[in-house]
């Protein structure tokens, strides 16, 4: 069965196509993505109106590219992200998916963006044991308890202020490195000393929430360090600042993720979201999972960021479990809860 997925929750227009066999195994047939990231760069972050307009311009070309790569005229089912995400951006993708589903006379599946990140980390088709998912991006930093792909997830904790990816972007702007901050900070951090500056780790005291995150204090600490150096006329090592900041972020993320696994008895940690492409996060997560006897599953770098494959993968899993399609009247929900894998 051929399933096509459309992703448009933020600044990427993604169309992915997967082939679902009778055993539930998935084969990726196409992964086409158009990003409007450069359109947002001069604003230092994603502008919702610009993102929506970019989706409108990119949807048809990206769809054509995906169908061409997959070598098909039409799929057997169409899925789309209906939340969470930017309201206007979600509307573009969901509306397109409904139109294509109606024109092709195939079922439509309205699915959860966050569930897609979990599904794409388990593309091998093997049954997913009781797991914890750490989803880290510019808009989300969450720990989720996962019983199986396509089933409702339970939120164990989330950020109380800035998402991890958002903190990267803000620190990058502070250092004059531009937007987005994740890739450039990761690159510079490799040349710096992660122990050079003792930046704080938020919510790491015994009295703090075990599974929640906070990165606003870290962001402020970086700003104060830079301001103090400028007042003193000192030249800072941008590489050391990046390395020390990144170490603080990854230390907290991986420590709490492994602890969450231990707290709920999960033997697998799933890592997803754009920040999951970060080299230090992947490295430290692997080290700590190995030490704790936990299996780490991480998607390829390309599938960490938003894409249509993850939406197709989640819908395919729902189809394999016998779920019917969603109504074409289903609306989008920018604040869709993780407990809702599919909207009917």
UniProtKB/Swiss-Prot annotation:
Instruction: Quote the cellular component terms of the Gene Ontology held in the record.
Output: cytoplasm
* Name this protein carries in UniProt: tRNA N6-adenosine threonylcarbamoyltransferase
Annotated GO biological process = tRNA threonylcarbamoyladenosine modification
Xref: InterPro entries: ATPase_NBD (IPR043129), Gcp-like_dom (IPR000905), KAE1/TsaD (IPR017861), Peptidase_M22_CS (IPR017860), TsaD (IPR022450)
Provide the species name: Corynebacterium efficiens (strain DSM 44549 / YS-314 / AJ 12310 / JCM 11189 / NBRC 100395)
User: Signal peptide span per the entry?
Assistant: none
Q: In which residues is substrate bound? A: 135-139, 169, 182, 186, 278
Q: Where in the cell is it found?
A: Cytoplasm
Q: Cross-referenced PROSITE patterns, in alphabetical order?
A: GLYCOPROTEASE
Entry cofactor note text? Binds 1 Fe(2+) ion per subunit.
Q: What is the lineage of its organism?
A: Bacteria, Bacillati, Actinomycetota, Actinomycetes, Mycobacteriales
Entry EC number(s): 2.3.1.234
Origin, by domain of life? Bacteria
């Amino acid at each position: 069965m051929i399933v096509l997925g459309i992703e448009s929750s933020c600044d990427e227009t993604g169309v992915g196509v997967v082939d679902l066999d009778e055993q539930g195994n998935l084969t990726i047939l196409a992964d086409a993505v158009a990003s409007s990231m450069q359109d947002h760069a001069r604003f230092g972050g994603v502008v919702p109106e610009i993102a929506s307009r970019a989706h409108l311009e990119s949807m048809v070309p990206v769809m054509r590219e995906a169908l061409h790569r997959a070598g098909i005229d039409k799929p057997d089912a169409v899925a789309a992200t209906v939340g969470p995400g930017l309201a206007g951006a979600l509307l573009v993708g969901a509306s397109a998916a409904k139109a294509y589903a109606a024109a092709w006379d195939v079922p439509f599946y309205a699915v959860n963006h966050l569930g897609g990140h979990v599904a794409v980390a388990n593309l091998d088709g093997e049954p997913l044991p009781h797991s914890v998912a750490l989803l880290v991006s510019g808009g989300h930093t969450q720990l989720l308890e996962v019983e199986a792909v396509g089933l409702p997830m339970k939120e164990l904790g989330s950020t109380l202020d800035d998402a991890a990816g958002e903190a990267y972007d803000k620190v990058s702007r502070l250092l004059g490195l531009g937007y987005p901050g994740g890739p450039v900070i990761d690159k510079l951090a490799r040349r710096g000393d992660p122990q050079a500056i003792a930046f704080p780790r938020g919510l790491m005291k015994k009295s703090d929430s075990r599974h929640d995150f906070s990165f606003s204090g870290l962001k402020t600490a970086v700003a104060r360090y830079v301001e103090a150096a400028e007042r003193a006329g000192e030249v800072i090592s941008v590489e050391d600042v990046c390395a020390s900041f990144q170490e603080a972020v990854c230390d907290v993320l991986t420590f709490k993720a492994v602890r969450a696994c231990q707290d709920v008895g999960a033997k697998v940690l799933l890592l997803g979201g754009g920040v999951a492409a970060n080299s230090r996060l992947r490295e430290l997560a692997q080290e700590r999972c190995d030490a704790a006897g936990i299996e780490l599953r991480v998607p390829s770098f390309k599938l960490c960021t938003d894409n249509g494959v993850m939406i197709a993968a989640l819908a395919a899993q729902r189809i394999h479990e016998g779920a019917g399609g969603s109504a074409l009247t289903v609306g989008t929900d920018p604040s869709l809860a993780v407990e809702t894998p599919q909207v009917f």
